[in-house]
Amino acid sequence: GSLESRWASEKMVQVLGFDIFSILVNFWRVLLTEPQKLYEEASKLSLSDYDTIKEQLLSWNKSQALFVGWHTNHYARNPIELDPIIGAAYYFFNHNLSYGPQYLGWLSSIYTPKKWEDMCYKLRNYRNPSLIVEESSFEKVIEAHPNDVLYLDPPYFLEESEDNKMFKGLYPNGNFAVHHNSFDHEKLRDLLHSHKGRFVLSYNDCEEIRNYYEGFEFYFPEWAYSYGQGETRVGKNKQEIGNTPKASHEILIVKN
């Protein structure tokens, strides 16, 4: 995430970053080790390639692994392999130009060839020698680093309650939130209550989460979400929460 990468690049703090989403991890590994090659591959792509690249990504064996046991065959494809650099370039292209953004989303109308060119140029100049990114689950990471300072950004807690404004999983896509819907929030709570080191935990603010982490410090930042900015439709869930989906409803939970 952006916070961890800034710690590493600006403060020169050694940061180990972990995520369960193998496609995101592949992107970061390539960006950290082969930024020039990643730039060269990404800069070959144009907005008119979006649908073709999306289909290639969907067929990627890493993507197909997401849909093992999925309830329909809508996303099923004959698996293909992609070179890690190509896969990273395709991921960057698809994610950054999509509405949301989200993985395997649809092309947003706000992007132009010039904006895409500017995005690619940032790849070329990226350097962050203090950051290492690996694929792992939160259970393994927390247990392997019992005394370290942790920053955690888990999927939103979705169980219905009077003050919970989140009602749909988003990771890696709202239509197949496989990493979101299966997340074990109680396991995370139990591990963090036993963690010896300090931590900062970012969550959606609701009574259940506040109860989970009673006794820790709470902070309530304010900002506006960019996801779906400009959307005017109001569904039943938004009506029930006051139709303020852009207003922040985050809580930072801190153990010092």
For the regions a protein language model found, what residue spans apply to each?
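Conserved S-adenosyl-L-methionine
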Residues: 1-50
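Class I S-adenosyl-L-methionine
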Residues: 1-16, 29, 120, 124-127, 136-149, 157-256
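SAM-dependent nucleic-acid methyltransferase catalytic core
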Residues: 35-169, 194
